[in-house]
Structures are given as structure tokens and as C-alpha cells.
Amino acid sequence: KRFSDGAQYRFEVPGIQGPKVMSALLEEMDRYDINLHRVTQTKGIMLLTDNEIIEMVKLAKQGQTDLILAIGPRATTDTSASVHTEEGVRMGYRLRGQEQIVRAIEDVKRAVAFGCRSFLVYDEGCLWVLNEMKRAGELPVDIHFKVSAHAGHGNPCSARMLEIIGASSINPVRDIQLQMLASMRQAIDIPIDIHTENPKSTGGFIRHYEVPEMIRVAAPIYLKTGGSVAATHSWD
């Protein structure tokens, strides 16, 4: 399996939270003559001003890279106390209540109005309703939805379910093993996004030595890099 241009892999840099750092990143990519295919913001659209979104969309077009903006509403910024407990943390970033679904949709619609077409999704129900809106013509037909590693998926059955309800690519759990990755690839056709390195908050492990095998068993694959310099998922 391959990308539409025949490539087996592409590069993605996550955790690019605003236009200033995005501009610096793209300048370095040019300096080293490296093609960057994706830039992902993780803190949430709701934490960006209109002008910041406009500038990031502009930079993406100039740099010929895809910009992925994260849906802002999530359990950790909701009023729930449970997510901050040892047991409750297992709910991840999923949305609680229909009101949060509505807010997430409005977050996406705001960014769409400024030209963004790719979004990072944390909640399966939110993914489903956004895809239904796409099918109904309420969102652009060229919109893409990337499922975050924070959704906690790591098996072929879950991967297939996500593909069915609208995922354009899937980021499995960060410590997924090669044989697990291979089984996911057998179940789906959409790209898989894989962390080749990780922030300290999610283990800090570096998997560069596994990259050739990742490509062999899981292409088409987005190789995510740059995470080991960050302290946390939404680090500035």
C-alpha cells in the first residue's frame, strides 16, 4: 500500500502550537532541504486567535505542507474533576455531554472558515458526527480527520471501526509494537501515523532504529518526529 503519489512514508512534526514556531520550523526545513508533509497543532483551535489561524494556514500553503489543527474542547479543559484523578484519567480527551460535541463542531467550523482542512480528533463520537456533516455537505468534501494517539487505539478492530466512521488517518498508541502495527495495516487502507520519538510525559522513548521496519510493515505511514524535545503533549 502507498500514498497517492507512490510514496511509502511522509514526515510530520507535531506540537507546533502557533505561527511563530511554525515559521521557524519551515525555515529550518528549507535550510536542510527536507520535505515536511504535515504540521500538527495540539493545544486546540479555541486557544488560537483568528489572525493566528490565518497566518498558520498561509504558512502551510507557502511551505506546501498540510496543517492539522486540534479540536479544542476536551475532558482536561472541561469542568469534570474526574479526568484529573488516577482512575478518571483513563477517559483521555473524550468529550462529556452533547454541549461539548456542539462546541467541538463549532471549533472546527471556525477553522474551516479560515481555510484549514485537516483536524486532530480525540473522540470517536465527534469523529462520527463530523464525518456525517461532511457527507451531508455541511463541511467541505476535502476535509480530513486524523485520530489522535490520545484516543488510545492500538488494535486492527478499532482501526477498522475508525476508518468506517470517517478517519482519514489513525495515530495508534505511542508504544505500539511492530507486529501490532502490521496487524492494523492489514485491516485498513488509510495512512497510519506513528511516533518515532516521544515527550518525557509519555515515556520519552526514541524509536528511530525501528523506522525502516515501521515503513516495511505499515506503509503508507506518517513518521512523527520532534517529540523528544518537548516536556508534554501540548508543550510550548
Put a short name on every predicted segment:
Residues 1-116, 121-153, 171, 178-236:
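Active-site pocket-lining/capping segments in soluble small-molecule metabolic enzymes
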Residues 165-168:
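Hydrophobic, aromatic-enriched interface-forming segments
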Residues 154-158:
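Short, glycine/polar-rich helix-capping loops at beta-to-alpha or helix-loop-helix junctions
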